[in-house]
Amino acid sequence: MYARNPPLNGSQSAQAPDWTPADADTGLQESMWRLGLGSDSYPERPGAPDCAYYMRTGVCGYGNRCRYNHPRDRASVEATVRATGQYPERFGEPPCQFYLKTGTCKFGASCKFHHPKNAGGSMSHVPLNIYGYPVREGDNECSYYLKTGQCKFGITCKFHHPQPAGTTVPPPPASAPQFYPSVQSLMPDQYGGPSSSLRVARTLLPGSYMQGAYGPMLLTPGVVPIPGWSPYSAPVSPALSPGAQHAVGATSLYGVTQLTSTTPSLPGVYPSLSSPTGVIQKEQAFPERPGEPECQYYLKTGDCKFGTSCKFHHPRDRVPPRANCVLSPIGLPLRPGVQRCTFYVQNGFCKFGSTCKFDHPMGTIRYNPSASSLADAPVAPYPVSSLLGALAAAPSSSSTELIAGGAKDAYMTGVPTSRSTSNISAGLIFSQSGGSIPFSELQLSSQSSLPLTGSRITRQGREIRRSF
């Protein structure tokens, strides 16, 4: 049932085990061998590439049979590689791809691949896009970059990273543009004596909101050399005020004629906009890929954020027409005669923004054509004081009433009086912040009701009476 071991005779039991204890000096010899102090040494082959395993660990399993070079001072060799940027050339081995792209290798002398001298750093000749990623025309596009706009591999990525849609890289200018004309040196008789600085008026810049010339510019002697100048010269008179500068006109300040508002502006520095402010017309050609699914965002809006790198089809004949509609102050299109956006009416905003095809009214205005004061009323937040002044200037034949809703904390009512008065009543609703009421909450209507002479404003428990 159970296997029995054969009996052992006395001769077999008396035999000693066939092994010898380890020598006490074995550990010391191993340490000396690792340090290269023993009799065994690795072959030095100056013409052959360095042994990668030996350079990394200091030992080599092949010993004298290894066909690579084993320099005695490994630290000096690695320091030389780091300083000179020379990496091992291993003919017959595959080339190091990272070295071919970047010109560097993080493994250094211990890399087991081939590093040709004249082939490293080819990445430096590859053009980069505006985000710093390589542009490789003809290669496959980086899918991660097309989705997120970023690439974790950076400059070492081997795929194509196209420029963003609508982005053009202008060529570098041949020379820096001259924003201000050069000023020539003045002779002592032209400025009437030494001064610590020279005053030169700046030219007008196109599109500025100032009608007069800009303030004078102070030029130090380092910019305009003046013979006989000394830092310890007579004090300079204080700068003229803006009103005094307009009064001076074209008179001479320190021998230099001040430029007036009639001076022609500098061409080419600030180009004027032919289109209205806030309206940007962008012409972009999107790729047509027959056989691919159609870009739904392009079909709805006529635009595509991926541009030429989009992988979907962009049919030109199905582009929605872009109507040149006017945008409201909050950036939503005003389309009179079109159905109102129900989402905007209920929530006060629209998730489609300027691409929405419905109307987003800011308020309705009904007025008598004879009342010219309301003809040019802007669709924007309107100050209460200015609104009262405009209403007061209107003729008495067309009384105007402002009807507002939505506020519950304050209101204003009028008390009717005789017909002989020519005052105008206004029902104003103040918001919590006070000061202005957006036209989206006001409705103007023309009526022939009795004029009002008094008003009462109730706000946060305080009552104020005014008489017009």
Curated annotation (Swiss-Prot):
Question: Which residue spans match zinc fingers labelled C3H1-type?
Answer: 45-73, 90-118, 136-164, 289-317, 335-363
Q: Which InterPro entries match?
A: Plant_ZF_CCCH, Znf_CCCH, Znf_CCCH_sf
Note the PROSITE patterns from the entry. ZF_C3H1 (PS50103)
Q: Which Pfam families match?
A: zf-CCCH
- List GO molecular-function terms, semicolon-separated: DNA binding; mRNA binding; zinc ion binding
Q: Which UniProt keywords apply?
A: DNA-binding, Metal-binding, Nucleus, Repeat, Zinc, Zinc-finger
Question: Can you say what this protein is called?
Answer: Zinc finger CCCH domain-containing protein 32
What species was this sequence derived from?
Answer: Arabidopsis thaliana (Mouse-ear cress)
